[in-house]
């Protein structure tokens, strides 16, 4: 079996194979951004009802509540995922809109100036916003599905991924 290159190594394991937080103290402070996306798929009748009601449910504004929950999640990512560094979030923006008749697209873009990226924060924000949409709509149906959730782009650090957002 060929030896793994240093770049292909799992960064949250030390040489003894024990979990560890990555030491970012030697990294340069740079602008970082990431955009993640999650989708919620509704049964046709539920999607039609949500469209007719302007994305409002008995619990209130679905989009507004999802944005608030997603933003809170972005700021608390380091409390949810053990080896994420606490970051000074400079910006967190959501775009939530229909992507077809039955699919709600949720995009979360996060920015900061720091030594490590914000991919996990963007993924967490999009995920929690999608979970919140589910919670707001579950009285209508439990036949909704969430996913895929994915990283769309990231900027800053060693490499950029995806189109600039």
UniProtKB/Swiss-Prot annotation:
<dbReference type="InterPro" id="IPR036522">
    <property type="entry name" value="MoaC_sf"/>
</dbReference>
<feature type="active site">
    <location>
        <position position="135"/>
    </location>
</feature>
<protein>
    <recommendedName>
        <fullName>Cyclic pyranopterin monophosphate synthase</fullName>
        <ecNumber>4.6.1.17</ecNumber>
    </recommendedName>
</protein>
<dbReference type="InterPro" id="IPR002820">
    <property type="entry name" value="Mopterin_CF_biosynth-C_dom"/>
</dbReference>
<comment type="subunit">
    <text>Homohexamer; trimer of dimers.</text>
</comment>
<dbReference type="GO" id="GO:0006777">
    <property type="term" value="P:Mo-molybdopterin cofactor biosynthetic process"/>
</dbReference>
<feature type="binding site">
    <location>
        <begin position="83"/>
        <end position="85"/>
    </location>
    <ligand>
        <name>substrate</name>
    </ligand>
</feature>
<feature type="binding site">
    <location>
        <begin position="120"/>
        <end position="121"/>
    </location>
    <ligand>
        <name>substrate</name>
    </ligand>
</feature>
<comment type="function">
    <text>Catalyzes the conversion of (8S)-3',8-cyclo-7,8-dihydroguanosine 5'-triphosphate to cyclic pyranopterin monophosphate (cPMP).</text>
</comment>
<keyword id="KW-0501">Molybdenum cofactor biosynthesis</keyword>
<comment type="pathway">
    <text>Cofactor biosynthesis; molybdopterin biosynthesis.</text>
</comment>
<dbReference type="GO" id="GO:0061799">
    <property type="term" value="F:cyclic pyranopterin monophosphate synthase activity"/>
</dbReference>
<keyword id="KW-0456">Lyase</keyword>
<dbReference type="Pfam" id="PF01967">
    <property type="entry name" value="MoaC"/>
</dbReference>
<dbReference type="InterPro" id="IPR023045">
    <property type="entry name" value="MoaC"/>
</dbReference>
<dbReference type="InterPro" id="IPR047594">
    <property type="entry name" value="MoaC_bact/euk"/>
</dbReference>
<comment type="similarity">
    <text>Belongs to the MoaC family.</text>
</comment>
